[in-house]
Amino acid sequence: MKCAVITDLHANREAVEAVLDHARSQGAERWVLLGDFVGYGADPGWVVDQVRALVRQGAIAVMGNHDQAVVRGASPSMRADARHVVEWTRAQLDASQLDFLASLPMTQRHGDQFYVHANAWAPAGWEYITGRAEAVRSLHATDCRYTFCGHMHEPKLFHLSGIGKAGDFVPTPGVAIPLPPHRQWLVIPGSVGQPRDGNPAAC
């Protein structure tokens, strides 16, 4: 069974539609959604409804930092423009949509797979995995073979061998990647709604 893992949708309806259509055309039957469904984009209500519908059909979903900010209100430490986006987004959502975002867990586990928006060592701290050191720290925080997270907006894979040797690489689109079971893997799929790798297409 093929599983589509997507993250950082950021209220971008056009990108979400394209990615969902593509995943379905590739035979995706399971869905994992790694948070940040709102923020930046113009269609938060539509995107939240799509995510909620997938969750009702059995998808796994976790909360992102933008989802939390919209639910709890803008932090005083946020820049003025970021606070404005949070407040605007909140005003676009009805009570049921806000309740859905508030109900999302920080992490989920399915067998030997761990799902989180930012990292596994402090999910609610929203620290980024910017390199091998953070990736290893995240992998050490769980006994799962595979960890999936978003937040970075650029696709990357990290791996850790049984003797503690770490490596990383950027995946090549359309090329299958073998995942040897003697390694732990940390997978960052990229971003649907706001990629930051220089490619305007959704990751």
Spans of features found by a protein language model:
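Hydrophobic/aromatic beta-strand patches that form the interior of the parallel beta-sheet core
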Residues: 32, 60-62, 116, 148, ...
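His/acidic metal-ligating clusters that form di-metal
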Residues: 26-27, 92-161
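Binuclear metal-dependent phosphoesterase catalytic core
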Residues: 172-203
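Metallo-beta-lactamase
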Residues: 30, 38, 154-178
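Active-site environment of divalent metal-dependent phosphoester hydrolases
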Residues: 10-15, 39-41, 66-71, 121-123, ...
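Core catalytic region of metal-dependent phosphoesterases/phosphodiesterases
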Residues: 2-6, 11-100
